């Protein structure tokens, strides 16, 4: 038997080893996959983000953004002189400068390989991951931030519309004793509560904490309003049921000690009654007769219970508040109302100005809430000024003058929001809105319904209250959810 050449077994082993080595590559080729190599990953990155085997600064930024590298700062910032701390998050422009490249340079495959250790170091240090979300929010804020012309223009427009509400008081004086006036006033008070409360929940307070609608806080804020509305609805239903059940156990005396105003009510209750629908008790009866086109009877008595805080002196014999009077004859309450309204309107303007520096829709939402709150307040304030001794012209002038303080607050709000953080202003306005809605206007809404409840008319005011609350809530909810999708101008 002829012996095999000694080198033949070695050759066979080499052939078998070669077939075994090429089998994975043949399988990969048959599967349509490129052969793996050190450059495969680089080629994949270049094909995904680059063009013609090169990367521009914009294309590199896209890659770095996907890796959360270089997004902690402005990506076109210039490198600073001096030693660098490697734990700092560098921008893509800084990385270009570190490799002696300009912002208009293009890097090839060999240059990109030099970037890999830098990118890996940035990923390993995690210097940019904590700043990524804040940077994206800042970029979105800068892109959607209104210009100075838009801020001042929209701000002055909204404040002007709100201030004009102070001039509407004279137009409703002849209708103060009408039933529809009380119904309309009740609706606007409920609307003001819904808008103020919802604006604080959906926009002002979340903005003070730095939230945005993408943080899914809107649904939780809606649940907060739902809890408030649930207890309001339940309380009203229980009161109606208990009233009907206990009605036959009590007499029908409408002049009990609970309904008669106390001395404190006579001195301080004028402010509390500015929208209670009982405005006929705040105006002398003979003046109401003249407003209705009737001459006062000789046996009519002048009701001055709510006017006891002023020194009427000898003015009870005529409608002195329809004529011009000296400022010294005007009651102190009128000046207190004017000053407090001026401060109130200043804070309103502050909130409007700060809101417009963030976004147009933020400013519009705040303006809508303030408008719904100012309309019923201005009507009531006008009546208070009349009862304090002012003429119609004087009441209109000082009511409008206090409303113009909103312009001053607007200017301060815009300047503060443009140069400083507006979060503190939003926090202040949010607390103020909650107080006005729940502690001020909510009791007024209940007082308006007292006369209807005495007359066993529960359903109509209850429906009006619900319509006002839900309308205000819906307006603020829609403005919050779709503020980023609707474009103005």
Swiss-Prot record:
This is Metal cation symporter ZIP14. Optimum temperature is 37 degrees Celsius. It is found in: Cell membrane; Apical cell membrane; Basolateral cell membrane; Early endosome membrane. Keywords: Cell membrane, Endosome, Glycoprotein, Ion transport, Lysosome, Membrane, Signal, Transmembrane, Transmembrane helix, Transport, Ubl conjugation, Zinc, Zinc transport. The chain crosses the membrane at residues 156-176, 185-205, 222-242, 350-370, 395-415, 422-442, 458-478. Optimum pH is 7.5. Widely expressed. Highly and transiently expressed during the early stage of adipocyte differentiation. Strongly expressed in liver, preadipocyte, duodenum and jejunum, moderately in brain, heart, skeletal muscle, spleen, pancreas, kidney and white adipose cells. Expression is almost undetectable in lung, testis and brown adipose cells. Expressed by chondrocytes and pituitary cells. A motif (HHHGHXHX-motif) lies at residues 248-255. It catalyses: Zn(2+)(out) + 2 hydrogencarbonate(out) = Zn(2+)(in) + 2 hydrogencarbonate(in); Mn(2+)(out) + 2 hydrogencarbonate(out) = Mn(2+)(in) + 2 hydrogencarbonate(in); Fe(2+)(out) + 2 hydrogencarbonate(out) = Fe(2+)(in) + 2 hydrogencarbonate(in); Cd(2+)(out) + 2 hydrogencarbonate(out) = Cd(2+)(in) + 2 hydrogencarbonate(in). The keyword Cell membrane applies. One of its GO terms (biological process) is inorganic cation transmembrane transport. Electroneutral transporter of the plasma membrane mediating the cellular uptake of the divalent metal cations zinc, manganese and iron that are important for tissue homeostasis, metabolism, development and immunity. Functions as an energy-dependent symporter, transporting through the membranes an electroneutral complex composed of a divalent metal cation and two bicarbonate anions. Beside these endogenous cellular substrates, can also import cadmium a non-essential metal which is cytotoxic and carcinogenic. Residues 1-28 form the signal peptide. Glycans are attached at residues 52, 75, 85, 100. GO terms for molecular function: cadmium ion transmembrane transporter activity; ferrous iron transmembrane transporter activity; iron ion transmembrane transporter activity; manganese ion transmembrane transporter activity; monoatomic anion:monoatomic cation symporter activity; monoatomic cation:bicarbonate symporter activity; zinc ion transmembrane transporter activity.
């Amino acid at each position: 038997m002829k012996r095999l050449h000694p080198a033949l077994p070695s050759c066979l082993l080499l052939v078998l080893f070669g077939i075994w080595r090429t089998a994975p590559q043949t399988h990969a080729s048959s599967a349509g996959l490129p052969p793996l190599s050190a450059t495969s990953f680089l080629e994949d990155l270049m094909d995904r983000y680059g063009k013609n085997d090169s990367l521009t600064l914009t294309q590199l930024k896209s890659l770095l953004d996907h890796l959360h590298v270089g997004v902690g700062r402005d990506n076109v910032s210039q490198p600073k002189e001096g030693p660098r701390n490697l734990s700092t998050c560098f921008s893509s422009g800084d990385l270009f400068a570190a490799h002696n490249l300009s912002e208009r340079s293009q890097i090839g495959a060999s240059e990109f390989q030099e970037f890999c250790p830098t990118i890996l170091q940035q990923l390993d240090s995690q210097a940019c991951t904590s700043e990524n979300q804040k940077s994206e929010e800042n970029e979105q804020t800068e892109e959607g931030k209104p210009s100075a012309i838009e801020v001042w223009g929209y701000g002055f427009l909204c404040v002007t519309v709100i201030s004009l509400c102070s001039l509407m008081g004279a137009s409703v004086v002849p209708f103060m004793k009408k039933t529809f006036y009380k119904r309309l006033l009740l609706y606007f008070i409920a609307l003001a509560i819904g808008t103020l409360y919802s604006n604080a929940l959906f926009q002002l307070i979340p903005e003070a904490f730095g939230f945005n609608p993408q943080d899914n806080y809107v649904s939780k804020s809606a649940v907060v309003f739902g809890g408030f509305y649930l207890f309001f609805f339940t309380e009203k239903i229980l009161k109606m049921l208990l009233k009907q059940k206990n009605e036959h156990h009590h007499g029908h005396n409408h002049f009990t000690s609970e309904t008669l105003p106390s001395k404190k009510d006579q001195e301080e209750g004028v402010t509390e009654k500015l929208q209670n629908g009982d405005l006929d008790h705040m105006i002398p009866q003979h003046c109401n007769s003249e407003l209705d086109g009737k001459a006062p009877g000789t046996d009519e008595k002048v009701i001055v219970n709510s006017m006891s805080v002023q020194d009427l002196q000898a003015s009870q014999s005529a409608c002195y508040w329809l004529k011009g009077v000296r400022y010294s004859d005007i009651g102190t309450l009128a000046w207190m109302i004017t000053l407090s309204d001026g401060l109130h309107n200043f804070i309103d303007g502050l909130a409007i100005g700060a809101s417009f520096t963030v976004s147009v829709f933020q400013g519009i939402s705040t303006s809508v809430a303030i408008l719904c709150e100012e309309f019923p307040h201005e009507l009531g304030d006008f009546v208070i000024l009349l009862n304090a001794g002012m003429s119609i012209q004087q009441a209109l002038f000082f009511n409008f003058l206090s409303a113009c303080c909103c312009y001053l607050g607007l200017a301060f709000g815009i300047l503060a929001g443009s140069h400083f953080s507006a979060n503190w202003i939003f926090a202040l306005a949010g607390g103020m809105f909650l107080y006005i809605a729940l502690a001020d206007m909510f009791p007024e809404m209940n007082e308006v319904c007292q006369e209807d409840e005495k007359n066993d008319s529960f359903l109509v005011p209850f429906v009006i209250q619900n319509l006002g609350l839900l309308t205000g809530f819906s307006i603020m909810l829609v403005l919050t959810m779709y503020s980023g999708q609707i474009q103005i101008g």
